[in-house]
Amino acid sequence: MAQFYSAKRRTTTRQIITVSVNDLDSFGQGVARHNGKTLFIPGLLPQENAEVTVTEDKKQYARAKVVRRLSDSPERETPRCPHFGVCGGCQQQHASVDLQQRSKSAALARLMKHEVSEVIADVPWGYRRRARLSLNYLPKTQQLQMGFRKAGSSDIVDVKQCPILVPQLEALLPKVRACLGSLQAMRHLGHVELVQATSGTLMILRHTAPLSSADREKLECFSHSEGLDLYLAPDSEILETVSGEMPWYDSNGLRLTFSPRDFIQVNAGVNQKMVARALEWLDVEPEDCVLDLFCGMGNFTLPLATQAASVVGVEGVPALVEKGQQNARLNGLQNVTFYHENLEEDVTKQPWAKNGFDKVLLDPARAGAAGVMQQIIKLEPIRIVYVSCNPATLARDSEALLKAGYTIARLAMLDMFPHTGHLESMVLFSRVK
């Protein structure tokens, strides 16, 4: 007769170890060494000692969590946000801005094997002009949650304030919560986006069921009382304008219109400085022909056109190409053309590329630009500026240019997202004569 035994659950007591942190990685984690292995510990800073327990043990590294901090770094700051440590938006509010910039610059320098020439930064607080807040109805309390996701979770942190938002948007948070929490459609709301443009404030509400006339009236009254442009999104394709006109923002002496769903850089201050520095690095001359790849709706293309003889912007999203053309007309720029192209194909064979380009700028998404590096090399530009939101793909793509005879002339860390683990950068490549 067979006998079955239930296995006893094995309990393990995690050992507490004492470590000294000697570095901060670009994600804001303290870095220590233990038994010859690198240990990553969120919440700790260089020059701090702590008792920790290992939570994940890999062959090359381990992760740990703090049990007790034994000393404080002189660069430790008191987080401004009461939600820090729970909300997944920020990872580094406990570190001084100077330390954040140094650690990100060091990580970038290691990846690129080149010294960081400068840090392009602006105000460290109140910089974010766009926010997407998740909404969730709680049946038990009949309350509406509004906030950001918890770190490593799909749960929502109900936020009352957010000091990295521009002041106009942060001040709106309790008012938006009160308005949305009074709607009959509370349980059918997906998320709300708030955008601060030069033209004013936008609110885009995603709802998953039709809104009653009473709810629509409440929302419209709210938009008028707060001076908002209101947009309703019943699905991912439809956007209904309830109040307001085409939004726009000022950038580098130009006026750029955009659709509420279009991508715009969330940090207006750093964006303006980044564009100005890119033009300076390219050393644009009045006779230059310039190519802007992954151009979007013309964040770099249009300012380039104010200095060059001609500029070509190439983008893979048709709606952004159309918006770029519209903004060129709006700003009276007749020396710039936008093209919709598949950037995985050889753009050097297109008619608009037959005369070549003196200078090239590219600003790809996180996946990088592996498919176009050889095409850029074929064009033989004198200077190339590569703007990156992913240092790993930047380092990979740079290898092609270095092998083709280009050198890194300048490398900047863009502090586009202070207090977070996001690292953006910009590189100037010059052709060796």
Swiss-Prot record:
<dbReference type="InterPro" id="IPR030391">
    <property type="entry name" value="MeTrfase_TrmA_CS"/>
</dbReference>
<feature type="domain" description="TRAM">
    <location>
        <begin position="10"/>
        <end position="68"/>
    </location>
</feature>
<protein>
    <recommendedName>
        <fullName>23S rRNA (uracil(1939)-C(5))-methyltransferase RlmD</fullName>
        <ecNumber>2.1.1.190</ecNumber>
    </recommendedName>
</protein>
<keyword id="KW-0479">Metal-binding</keyword>
<keyword id="KW-0949">S-adenosyl-L-methionine</keyword>
<feature type="binding site">
    <location>
        <position position="299"/>
    </location>
    <ligand>
        <name>S-adenosyl-L-methionine</name>
    </ligand>
</feature>
<keyword id="KW-0408">Iron</keyword>
<dbReference type="GO" id="GO:0070041">
    <property type="term" value="F:rRNA (uridine-C5-)-methyltransferase activity"/>
</dbReference>
<comment type="function">
    <text>Catalyzes the formation of 5-methyl-uridine at position 1939 (m5U1939) in 23S rRNA.</text>
</comment>
<dbReference type="GO" id="GO:0051539">
    <property type="term" value="F:4 iron, 4 sulfur cluster binding"/>
</dbReference>
<feature type="binding site">
    <location>
        <position position="363"/>
    </location>
    <ligand>
        <name>S-adenosyl-L-methionine</name>
    </ligand>
</feature>
<feature type="binding site">
    <location>
        <position position="81"/>
    </location>
    <ligand>
        <name>[4Fe-4S] cluster</name>
    </ligand>
</feature>
<feature type="binding site">
    <location>
        <position position="342"/>
    </location>
    <ligand>
        <name>S-adenosyl-L-methionine</name>
    </ligand>
</feature>
<dbReference type="InterPro" id="IPR029063">
    <property type="entry name" value="SAM-dependent_MTases_sf"/>
</dbReference>
<dbReference type="Pfam" id="PF05958">
    <property type="entry name" value="tRNA_U5-meth_tr"/>
</dbReference>
<keyword id="KW-0411">Iron-sulfur</keyword>
<feature type="binding site">
    <location>
        <position position="162"/>
    </location>
    <ligand>
        <name>[4Fe-4S] cluster</name>
    </ligand>
</feature>
<dbReference type="InterPro" id="IPR030390">
    <property type="entry name" value="MeTrfase_TrmA_AS"/>
</dbReference>
<dbReference type="GO" id="GO:0005506">
    <property type="term" value="F:iron ion binding"/>
</dbReference>
<keyword id="KW-0004">4Fe-4S</keyword>
<feature type="binding site">
    <location>
        <position position="90"/>
    </location>
    <ligand>
        <name>[4Fe-4S] cluster</name>
    </ligand>
</feature>
<keyword id="KW-0698">rRNA processing</keyword>
<feature type="binding site">
    <location>
        <position position="315"/>
    </location>
    <ligand>
        <name>S-adenosyl-L-methionine</name>
    </ligand>
</feature>
<dbReference type="InterPro" id="IPR001566">
    <property type="entry name" value="23S_rRNA_MeTrfase_RlmD"/>
</dbReference>
<keyword id="KW-0808">Transferase</keyword>
<keyword id="KW-0489">Methyltransferase</keyword>
<feature type="binding site">
    <location>
        <position position="265"/>
    </location>
    <ligand>
        <name>S-adenosyl-L-methionine</name>
    </ligand>
</feature>
<dbReference type="InterPro" id="IPR012340">
    <property type="entry name" value="NA-bd_OB-fold"/>
</dbReference>
<feature type="binding site">
    <location>
        <position position="294"/>
    </location>
    <ligand>
        <name>S-adenosyl-L-methionine</name>
    </ligand>
</feature>
<feature type="active site" description="Nucleophile">
    <location>
        <position position="389"/>
    </location>
</feature>
<dbReference type="InterPro" id="IPR002792">
    <property type="entry name" value="TRAM_dom"/>
</dbReference>
<feature type="binding site">
    <location>
        <position position="87"/>
    </location>
    <ligand>
        <name>[4Fe-4S] cluster</name>
    </ligand>
</feature>
<dbReference type="GO" id="GO:0003723">
    <property type="term" value="F:RNA binding"/>
</dbReference>
<dbReference type="GO" id="GO:0070475">
    <property type="term" value="P:rRNA base methylation"/>
</dbReference>
<comment type="similarity">
    <text>Belongs to the class I-like SAM-binding methyltransferase superfamily. RNA M5U methyltransferase family. RlmD subfamily.</text>
</comment>
<dbReference type="InterPro" id="IPR010280">
    <property type="entry name" value="U5_MeTrfase_fam"/>
</dbReference>
<dbReference type="Pfam" id="PF01938">
    <property type="entry name" value="TRAM"/>
</dbReference>
